[in-house]
């Protein structure tokens, strides 16, 4: 999509709001590349399983990232972290690229599924015994964003058949689309246990006995922008225009999304 005027400012406001909220929760911001090598995609599990959904630059054998999870998690490839430095908490805003091969029909038009979209991602690395607590904290963070945006939402715990094989547990957050009369996913928050860490050889060293152990990795969208923009527009319509959530007004500089000049 092309955003113009107040629409462009709304997009930028959401990005800054999501990053600021992540920083307040202790996440360090990363600005990663959007082009990665095959080893990076393999390390986080996108390759070879999802190769058909990724854009491949054949000439140089690089891939466009489907999510910031790929470059950010790969920062810790072949790294041994000190126990005292855990948990690692990173966030990143990037453009994401997905082929959406095999997706056809009215349900994938508009902002439902895009080949390129903006997203803020959370990545955490923690000790095995603390990863469930980290997962719960990430879930609470994403839920807090949706509450501040004043959007109708629901949380789904995915069954094994709906999860990626890389995840040990995953929750989806969905917002309601009034126009489509259905729920749309805006975030998935996953605990990968040792799956990615084993591929990446991401370990930590115990303080007492100096032995090393595989970390647990987690990630979640906080949040994906296109569907959030659509949800704000659908759920906040008034005769004067589209009302902005209070949390966004300081970021975008206006209370109503309308055709008046910025």
PLM regions: where:
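TRNA-recognition modules of translation machinery and tRNA-sensing kinases, especially anticodon-binding
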Residues: 1-262
């Amino acid at each position: 999509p092309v955003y113009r005027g107040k629409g462009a400012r709304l997009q930028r406001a959401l990005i800054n709001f999501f990053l600021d909220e992540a920083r307040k929760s202790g996440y360090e911001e990363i600005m990663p590349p959007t082009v990665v090598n095959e080893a990076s995609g393999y390390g986080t599990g996108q390759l070879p399983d999802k190769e058909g959904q990724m854009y491949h630059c054949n000439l140089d054998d690089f891939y466009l990232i489907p999510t910031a999870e790929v470059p950010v998690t790969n920062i810790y490839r072949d790294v041994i972290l000190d126990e005292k430095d855990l948990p690692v908490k990173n966030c990143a805003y990037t453009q994401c690229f997905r082929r959406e091969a095999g997706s056809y029909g009215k349900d994938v038009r508009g902002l439902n599924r895009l080949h390129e979209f903006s997203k803020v991602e959370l990545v955490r690395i923690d000790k095995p015994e603390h990863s469930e607590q980290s997962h719960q904290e990430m879930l609470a963070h994403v839920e807090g964003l949706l509450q501040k945006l004043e959007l109708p939402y629901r949380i789904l715990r995915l069954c094994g058949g709906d999860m990626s094989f890389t995840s040990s547990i995953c929750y989806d957050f969905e917002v309601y689309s009034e126009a489509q009369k259905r729920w749309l996913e805006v975030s998935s928050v996953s605990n990968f246990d040792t799956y990615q860490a084993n591929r990446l050889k991401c370990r930590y060293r115990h303080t007492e006995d100096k032995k090393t152990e595989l970390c647990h990795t987690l990630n979640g969208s906080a949040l994906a922008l296109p569907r959030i923009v659509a949800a704000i527009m659908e759920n906040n319509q008034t005769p004067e225009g589209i009302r902005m959530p209070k949390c966004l007004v300081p970021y975008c500089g206006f209370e109503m999304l309308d055709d008046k000049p910025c």
